[in-house]
């Protein structure tokens, strides 16, 4: 098998330059894909430029960033399509081979304290944006089943964590849409979701000790979450002190599974939620 099985393919990745998204961008570029990466905040501009330069130099691929506010369901899809057309070809010859709907926002609220504004904010980014971005790119998907769509969900869709009325609800919606799209787009692309558990990053550290305590019984049952000597010393220390000796996933561990679903070898897998959580959930 080629070490660059995605040579010449075009991937669109939302939330492409931070956390899991940056790891996905790196993974796809290393396999030869050109990447149109979408980011929202000005604070990501420098990190996007740095990653673009590093990946283009390392892998000889084309990486382009487009800034688009995914909470704007009309403007952001238009900007993404225009950027793809400008950099990778006009409508008549543009093909988007891979779409990774990764961007997401969180918000933890007990049921009695859910603000209406937060409902609209979180559902706009986590549910409506994947719908509208996928819809906008639909004309450019392959017509031979070779396309790949991967939606980044979460174990929050099924675990019933306290305070996850909004976040867990959006991820359950995304998984339901994954199954629908797998049928609707069967002649164009496979459509799957990946459901990480705890992942090292801003959202995980911001959740704090109360949430880590809620996770503890689930993490203790996850066979791959136990820290080892090969893990980063500071993470081992923190896990042993605060997390019952269990660690969150590294970004690359999730990105590798996403990459598997983007490759030609995943052609017979569609409509599935593929676990990427160290065994916190046992299912496909």
For the regions a protein language model found, what residue spans apply to each?
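Short C-terminal tail/terminal secondary-structure segment
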Residues: 2, 111, 159, 241, ...
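Substrate-binding pocket helix/loop in short-chain dehydrogenase/reductase
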Residues: 110-111, 115-120, 149, 211-215, ...
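Active-site helix of classical SDR
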Residues: 134, 170, 178
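Alpha-helical segment proximal to the catalytic Tyr-Lys
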Residues: 139, 182-187, 267
